[in-house]
């Protein structure tokens, strides 16, 4: 097929009824990019024989090397549908906006960016591997965004060539697979019903499940270039069987059988013991199996000739005689069941046009935006109707910023000449040769006619730089180059329309064609496009609107929080400015990465995982900063906690563990503090209700303190409780405690702070009731406890933010102020005034040290950041997977065999600190047969005291005085302390009196 000119695609943008915007979603390596290749081949962009091997939309070097997609990429395609209507031939041209998205868990943010721009999605599932962890993630994203989903059961050829299943076995395998996917959808539906249990709103489950007879399931082999829906076979057999197509389509899936004598469709109860095959097996699968049997398994040229004749297709003799069976398969299937036709026809039939999609989704999307009732009603109506008239307000959603090389922009690229232009140039050239005119002048004329906009292209491109382009969808109106629009930041709120809003001029508009861009003058509503000129204004996502009172569409929740941190510095210090500029561009171009500057001046990037980190470093070195960068070892987060061990409680029955009394250096002020561990249930409750704690914290004092909370917390979908409900649940949890914490349920009104950052899982109690007593006696300058409450809270926040073990955040302690006395009899009582500048520092220092001693009085523990690891492996390599997990100090928590497949699913927990290189090692040990997916699971306590030394006779006998067994917790703690420059008790020289002879 000839290449479709961009002008043809641009002309189709104005007809919203014939536009389809969809994305490809799947688990890693389930065939998204291979399927996209076949769709591109239908437009002549790549050869149909190379489809599946080119991976055209994976144009990054690291994507090609690893064989996985890392960045979402978009391309526009043309598709013509010819139909018969009342004996008239009707032709319709469609514009297909396709977005290919990554499947690896590290790039989940790219999936949400792609999904938000589309009206539908094809979710690919490997026919052998089935539903995997990332399959559930992408299905959940599609459910949240309310887009139409079509299931593609890909790699059907593996059932024949690898599993060697018979058609009847494959039938039951596919039935179970569709049920598995529907079970996932069912969990989303029931979960939403539970959330709306208190409301009168009723959600229908009509149309949410996948059923091949309804046309929302496609069976495919993207690598072999074929795909089909049931209606294709029902149309073929309609006349032969004498059944109506709709009725036949319903019978081609499930337990339906055809009586060969009466030509009637039977159900299982009417079989009467006869062994008939299901119609799906008889009319669909056996035909596919016959092709593979004759072309691949047992090559039989005679059978191949019969198949070609029966299908009424033409296959070249060279393809029939080819030694590579794939050439023959492609030649047969691309004429019989072409993949692009099945996918695109399904997209046109099942996925709604932008007009229909926005009519159904617009109200729900807008109702989730801040202060929806204040939005201009004209914008709401224009969005619902997808009105593209120039009089309507422009509303655009910027999903993410994409980096393009400046030389790849249309104004720096030579325009490709049409056949007519090339013919004209050749004729002029031949005339010049005949007339003897110097050809140099002709070449100059040719270059001048080569492009209308070559001005500026002669600029020096040696210093090539990257330009950030917005990846966008327009919902209403028509946006034009040179038009002025308002940019709403993520924090924009119609209540304060003057904040987080900027006015910009649209510099350029583009049609995205993979790694190429096509210049546009205007873009009407319903289209996916790229927009330039926003690099200094938009950070990651934004909303563009021609009105200052529009909706803020940036309500995307980030599913994958960055957990791996790395400190960066330039190899040449004088290039620090380039590093800072590069980090700013990376921060805009990557939706998941986070950039921070530490107190010591270090620049730190936070990534979702090891592969994500490698991609970010590569982008910095080669695209954004273009300098040599030195990266530290990954900085893994820890948490510090303390517990009550049985032996500790037995030794100190009469002593109060964790109680510390301290006096200020100026004298006269005595503070008694008790530190007690919180139970896991209380800690989980506090972590779950961070937003509620934020609201409660603002009422703790007469001053409304600034509450620091991370952006991810403010965007979370957690349940926000009222203060009364929060205290009621907390009281109930404390009442269940068997320790001294049980009595604290009666002192909930004495809570004066949570920490760290005023929202953490640690509690500060004031049992003395003095910290909030602001009544004074006659002397107004004399200290009272309430004057020092702010400094006590500050000390609590500091020590919980940087704990005693290795200055990592503390989790799960309760600090109670049991004593707070200010003596009048002290010799230094004159110094105890509110005007003494020494008091604040001394209070903070003393309280911090007291909490530290109380914390260490119990049995301290480190909490490790953990990855949840899913590995799919065969029985042959299962033992090696266990070996690698054990070597990395992980533990297997579940193992199950996938029914009907040779695969085992192994679920394990692995410390993040031990995970670097884990994926590579698994691949090496299993020869590529197993690939892990790592998702951040949370923090888990390492049950080992970092200060433990042998003390009992048995321990001394087994381990010796120096403890021959390595203390893992101590090693982790010392490594963090070394990195942070904290004191480490380690001998630099050990046994110096011994001679050591070195051989040179």
Swiss-Prot record:
Top EC group: hydrolase
UniProt keyword list: Cytoplasm, GTP-binding, Hydrolase, Nucleotide-binding, Ribosome biogenesis
Single GO term (MF): GTPase activity
Transmembrane segments: none
InterPro entries: EFG_II, EFG_III/V, EFG_V-like, EFL1, P-loop_NTPase, Ribosomal_Su5_D2-typ_SF, Ribsml_uS5_D2-typ_fold_subgr, Small_GTP-bd
Protein family according to the UniProt entry: Belongs to the TRAFAC class translation factor GTPase superfamily. Classic translation factor GTPase family.
Name assigned to this protein: Ribosome assembly protein 1
Organism in which the protein naturally occurs: Schizosaccharomyces pombe (strain 972 / ATCC 24843)
Gene this chain is encoded by: ria1
């Amino acid at each position: 097929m000839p290449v479709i000119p961009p002008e043809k695609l641009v002309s189709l943008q104005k007809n919203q009824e014939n536009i389809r915007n969809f994305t490809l979603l799947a688990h890693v390596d389930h065939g998204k990019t291979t399927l996209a290749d076949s769709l591109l081949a239908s437009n002549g962009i790549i050869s149909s024989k190379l489809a599946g091997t080119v991976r055209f939309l994976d144009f990054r070097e690291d994507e090609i090397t690893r064989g996985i997609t890392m960045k979402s990429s978009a391309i526009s395609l043309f598709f013509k549908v010819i139909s018969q209507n009342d004996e008239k031939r009707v032709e319709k041209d469609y514009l297909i906006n396709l977005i290919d998205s990554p499947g690896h868990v590290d790039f989940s943010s790219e999936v949400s960016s792609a999904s938000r721009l589309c009206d539908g999605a094809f979710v690919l599932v490997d026919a052998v591997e089935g539903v995997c962890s990332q399959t559930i993630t992408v299905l959940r994203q599609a459910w949240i965004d309310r887009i139409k989903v079509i299931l593609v059961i890909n790699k059907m050829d593996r059932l024949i060539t690898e599993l060697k299943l018979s058609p009847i076995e494959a039938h039951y395998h596919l039935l179970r697979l569709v049920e598995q996917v529907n079970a996932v959808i069912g969990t989303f539906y029931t979960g939403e019903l539970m959330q709306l249990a208190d409301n009168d709103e009723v959600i229908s489950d009509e149309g949410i499940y996948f059923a091949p007879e309804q046309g929302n399931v496609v069976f495919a082999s993207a690598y072999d270039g074929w795909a089909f829906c049931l209606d294709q076979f029902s149309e073929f057999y309609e006349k032969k069987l004498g059944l109506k197509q709709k009725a036949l389509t319903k019978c081609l899936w499930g337990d339906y059988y055809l009586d060969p004598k009466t030509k009637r469709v039977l159900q299982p109860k009417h079989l009467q013991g006869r062994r008939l095959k299901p119609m799906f097996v008889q009319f669909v699968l056996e035909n596919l199996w016959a092709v593979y049997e004759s072309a691949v398994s047992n090559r039989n040229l005679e059978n191949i000739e019969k198949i070609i004749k029966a299908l009424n297709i033409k296959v070249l003799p060279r393809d029939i005689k080819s030694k590579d069976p794939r050439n023959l398969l492609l030649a047969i299937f691309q004429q019989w069941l072409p993949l692009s036709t099945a996918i695109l026809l399904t997209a046109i039939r099942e996925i709604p046009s932008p007009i229909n999609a926005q009519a159904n989704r617009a109200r729900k999307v807008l109702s989730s935006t801040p202060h929806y009732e204040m939005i201009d009603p004209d914008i709401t109506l224009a969005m619902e109707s997808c009105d593209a008239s120039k009089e309507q307000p422009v509303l655009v959603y910027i999903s993410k910023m994409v980096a393009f090389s400046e030389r790849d922009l249309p104004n720096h690229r030579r325009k490709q000449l049409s056949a007519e232009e090339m013919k004209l140039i050749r004729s002029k050239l031949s005339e010049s040769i005949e007339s003897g005119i110097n050809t140099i002048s002709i070449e100059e004329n040719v270059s001048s006619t080569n492009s209308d906009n070559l001005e500026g292209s002669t600029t020096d491109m040696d210093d090539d730089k990257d330009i950030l382009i917005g990846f966008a969808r327009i919902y209403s109106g028509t946006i034009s180059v040179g038009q002025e629009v308002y940019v709403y930041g993520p924090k924009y709120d119609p209540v304060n329309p003057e904040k987080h809003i900027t006015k910009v001029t649209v510099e350029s508009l583009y049609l995205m064609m993979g790694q190429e861009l096509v210049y546009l003058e205007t873009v009407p509503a319903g289209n996916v496009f790229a927009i330039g000129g926003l690099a200094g204004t938009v950070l990651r996502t934004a909303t563009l609107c021609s009105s200052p009172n529009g909706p803020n569409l940036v309500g995307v929740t980030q599913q994958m929080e960055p957990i791996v941190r790395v400190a960066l510095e330039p190899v040449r210090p004088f290039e620090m400015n380039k590093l800072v500029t590069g980090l700013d561009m990376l921060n805009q171009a990557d939706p998941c990465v986070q950039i921070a500057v530490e107190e010591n001046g270090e620049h730190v990037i936070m990534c979702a995982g090891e592969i994500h980190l490698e991609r970010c470093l590569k982008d910095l070195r080669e695209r954004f900063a273009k300098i040599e960068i030195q990266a530290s070892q990954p900085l893994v987060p820890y948490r510090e906690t303390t517990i009550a061990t049985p032996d500790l409680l037995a030794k100190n029955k009469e002593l109060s563990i964790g109680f510390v009394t301290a006096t200020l250096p100026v004298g006269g002020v005595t503070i008694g503090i008790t530190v007690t561990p919180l139970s896991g249930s209380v800690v989980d409750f506090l972590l779950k209700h961070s937003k509620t704690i934020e609201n409660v914290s603002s009422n703790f004092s007469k001053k409304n303190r600034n509450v620091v909370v991370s952006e991810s917390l403010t965007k979370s979908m957690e349940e926000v409780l009222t203060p009364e409900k929060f205290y009621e649940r907390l009281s109930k949890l404390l009442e269940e405690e068997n320790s001294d914490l049980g009595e604290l349920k009666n002192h909930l009104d004495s809570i004066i702070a949570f920490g760290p950052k005023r929202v953490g899982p640690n509690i500060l109690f004031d049992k003395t009731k003095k910290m909030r007593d602001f009544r004074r006696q006659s002397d107004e300058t004399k200290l009272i406890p309430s004057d020092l409450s702010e400094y006590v809270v500050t000390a609590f926040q500091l020590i919980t933010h940087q704990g005693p073990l290795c200055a990592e955040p503390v989790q799960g302690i309760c600090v109670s102020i049991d004593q707070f006395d200010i003596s009048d009899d002290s010799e230094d009582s004159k110094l105890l005034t509110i005007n003494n500048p020494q008091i604040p520092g001394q209070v903070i220092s003393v309280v911090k040290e007291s909490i530290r001693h109380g914390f260490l009085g119990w049995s301290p523990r480190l909490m490790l950041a953990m990855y949840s690891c899913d590995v799919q492996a065969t029985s042959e390599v299962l033992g090696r997977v266990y070996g690698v997990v054990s070597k990395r100090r992980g533990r297997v928590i579940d193992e199950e065999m996938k029914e009907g497949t040779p695969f085992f699913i192994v679920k394990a927990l692995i410390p993040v600190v031990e995970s670097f290189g884990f994926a590579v090692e698994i691949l090496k040990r299993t020869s590529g047969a197993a690939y892990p997916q790592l998702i951040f699971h949370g923090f888990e306590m390492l049950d080992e005291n970092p200060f433990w030394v042998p003390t009992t006779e048995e321990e001394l006998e087994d381990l010796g005085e120096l403890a021959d067994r390595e203390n893992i917790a101590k090693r982790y703690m010392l490594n963090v302390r070394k990195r942070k420059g904290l004191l480490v008790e380690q001998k630099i020289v050990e046994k110096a009196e011994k001679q050591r002879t070195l051989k040179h």
